[in-house]
């Protein structure tokens, strides 16, 4: 009787231990897989990044054909230093200004150019005559003039700070010349002379 009771309690403990072990195992597996970190969503890459990766990380403003067809032209700037006088008054310090009277040339032909030499073979003397160096940017500067009597006068002058090349086409010049020629060639009194001649002929016949 005692042995049967011990055997019964032993089976009961074995069943309880088996259930708790299976529950512990299931809990462990659930906890393990519930804390799996999801991969972070990739940040949307912009088109510029994709293009940069495809082009090897280099950015080009234009293609090679544009480089050969478009010739960038610049002025050979002339700098002058002079004194300004007004009667018996002369500027205390010399005035340094930029004179836009140089020749327009491609950038590779300018003395301070450090880039490549593309586009120079398309340049000719005729092309240089179509471009003119003109004023681009100016600023107002104050200068002091000292007179012989010891007084000091202050003047405001405009100083050129940058030059640019402006293109004048040959057709524009020719059309302007033709317009002037035709306007000058038309006699104003031509029709009046005809009327006078017709009137004089009528009087003579009458």
Curated annotation (Swiss-Prot):
GO molecular function term, any single one: BMP binding
Keyword terms, alphabetized: Disulfide bond, Glycoprotein, Secreted, Signal, Wnt signaling pathway
Name under which the protein is recorded: Sclerostin domain-containing protein 1
Family to which this protein belongs: Belongs to the sclerostin family.
Residues spanning the signal sequence: 1-22
Summary of the function given for this chain in its UniProt record: Can activate or inhibit Wnt signaling in a context-dependent manner. Activates the canonical Wnt pathway whereby acts through Disheveled proteins and beta-catenin. Antagonises Wnt signaling through the canonical pathways presumably by blocking accessibility of certain WNTs to their receptors. Induces posterior neural markers via components of the canonical Wnt pathway.
Subunit structure: Interacts with LRP6.
GO cellular component terms, A-Z: extracellular space
Sections of the chain in a coiled coil: none
One BP annotation, GO: negative regulation of BMP signaling pathway
Localization, UniProt: Secreted
Species name: Gallus gallus
Keyword tRNA processing appears in the UniProt entry: no
Intrachain S-S bonds: 75-133, 89-147, 100-163, 104-165
Composition bias, Basic residues: 188-206
Glycosylation sites: 47, 173
InterPro entries tied to this protein: Cys_knot_C, Cystine-knot_cytokine, Sclerostin/SOSTDC1
Domain CTCK: start-end pairs: 75-170
Disordered, as annotated region: 40-68, 176-206
Pfam family, one: Sclerostin
